[in-house]
Design a protein with these regions (language model features):
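Helix-start/capping segments and mature chain N-termini
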Residues: 1-31, 35-39, 43, 56-222
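Hydrophobic alpha-helical interaction segments
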Residues: 47-51
Length: 222
């Protein structure tokens, strides 16, 4: 939420409805949520905030907290365990977040900014808090949803824009990528400078990434 205006709100609400359907429950008081949301947003008329809506069969909770934002390039470490690409709740954003929380905790303790997650086929999935994109032989690619990827909002937008295509990405291919960045609604676009000690030189593409970020900002409130 920037200066009281929520970004990509329609997409987040649709994803929440989809997640509830996958989990086989109806969100209580969904139609009345709007008035509560308006009141909550009135407290965030200036500055940047993180809005979180958590729905269950019994209740819906909305919270708003100040957010400082992400800056600079990040350093990723490959988590030492593998995740199943066929988890039943993988396609929905749920409170079943233990694997991702622990991966982020591990990364921080090891001196990384975040953890890169692989599935049990040794394929690249995502970062614990973001989706990931690579430049491969002049073409932007992102891990295929069949690898167990969570379908993030920014990832979906970039695919709709035909900016990148989904492919299966073996972890062994990491050394062959020319550039890398991660995406999330809180980050938009954030370059990756290292993965497990492997340096990535994004400098030739920073202008393009800046332009992409500006394009996302221009449609954030649509």
């Amino acid at each position: 939420v920037i200066d009281g205006r929520p970004q990509f709100l329609d997409r987040h609400l649709q994803r929440m409805l989809t997640g509830a359907k996958i989990s086989d429950f109806e969100i209580v008081h969904y139609e009345e949520m709007g008035s509560g949301l308006v009141e909550l947003l009135s407290r965030a008329s200036t500055g940047t905030h993180r809005l979180r809506i958590t729905a269950s069969p019994e209740s819906t909770l909305m919270t708003l907290t100040e957010f400082q934002g992400y800056t600079g390039e990040i350093d990723l470490g490959i988590a030492p365990w593998r995740l199943s690409q066929s988890r039943p709740l993988q396609m929905s954003k749920s409170t079943s977040y233990g694997d991702y929380w622990y991966a982020r905790k591990w990364a921080t303790e090891m001196g990384f900014d975040d953890a890169l997650l692989l599935n049990n086929q040794e394929e690249i999935m995502e970062v614990s808090t973001a989706n990931i994109f690579f430049l491969n032989k002049g073409e932007w690619v992102t891990p295929h949803e069949n690898s167990g990827v969570f379908p993030g909002v920014i990832r979906s937008i970039l695919l709709e824009m035909n900016f990148a295509k989904q492919v299966d990405l073996a972890s062994a291919a990491l050394s062959g990528f020319s550039a890398c960045f991660v995406t999330s609604s809180l980050r938009l676009i954030q370059p990756v400078k290292k993965i497990d000690g492997l340096s990535i030189d994004n400098s030739p593409f920073m202008k393009d990434l800046h332009s992409l970020r500006q394009e996302l900002e221009s449609i954030a409130y649509a």
